[in-house]
């Protein structure tokens, strides 16, 4: 399986029901490569929307991860920071479905499962119904309260299993 084929497989999964085009990896003469999006006729898609551009890069990352796993080379965890911030609710669901089917350690830092509602301490509540759809071990990272807002040394993190 080639890198482009694997990337386009993931691009399709991440963009169900939306325009997705095709990922192309263009080799440059200086041993570099450029990732572009093309239309069915092969013409380049300039300035795709933020969500499509994000899924294009994600699809390449997933493809590299898949191909290195197949070749039994180094298997590294995937780490994402706010990966779905530009996604609609449906596209966010597609992302988590794809992640759920990748058989490797994945760490995702996101606020996607926090609600506008707060508890008695003023902390955002977790949307447990939405979170229950994610088939993975889940943790919440939050600030230990109280802390002094003017003294960095008072900041501590709490990891809570969900």
Regions picked out by a protein language model, each given a short descriptive name:
Residues 1-27:
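Amphipathic alpha-helical domain-onset/packing element
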Residues 22, 30, 84-87, 97:
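Eukaryotic, compositionally biased intrinsically disordered regions
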Residues 48, 68-73, 98-102, 115:
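Conserved catalytic network of the ASCE P-loop NTPase/AAA+ motor domain
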Residues 50-57, 79, 105, 120-121:
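Glycine-rich phosphate-binding loop
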Residues 61-69:
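Metal-dependent nuclease catalytic cores in nucleic-acid-processing enzymes
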Residues 74-83:
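Walker B catalytic motif
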Residues 91-162:
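C-terminal lobe/lid and adjacent interdomain/linker elements of RecA-like ASCE P-loop ATPase modules
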């Amino acid at each position: 399986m080639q890198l482009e084929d694997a990337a386009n497989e993931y691009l399709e999964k991440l963009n169900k029901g939306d325009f997705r085009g095709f990922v192309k990896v263009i080799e440059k003469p200086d041993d570099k490569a450029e990732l572009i999006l093309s239309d069915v006729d092969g013409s380049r898609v300039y300035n795709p929307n933020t969500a499509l551009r994000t899924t294009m890069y994600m699809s390449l990352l997933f493809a590299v991860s898949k191909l290195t796993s197949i070749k039994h080379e180094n298997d590294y965890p995937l780490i994402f920071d706010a990966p779905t911030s530009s996604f609609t609710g449906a596209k966010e669901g597609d992302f988590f479905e794809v992640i759920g089917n990748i058989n490797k350690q994945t760490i995702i830092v996101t606020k996607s499962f926090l609600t506008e509602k707060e508890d008695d301490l003023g902390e955002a509540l977790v949307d447990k119904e939405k979170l229950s759809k994610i088939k993975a071990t889940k943790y919440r990272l939050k600030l230990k309260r109280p802390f002094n807002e003017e003294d960095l040394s008072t900041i501590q993190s709490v990891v809570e299993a969900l």
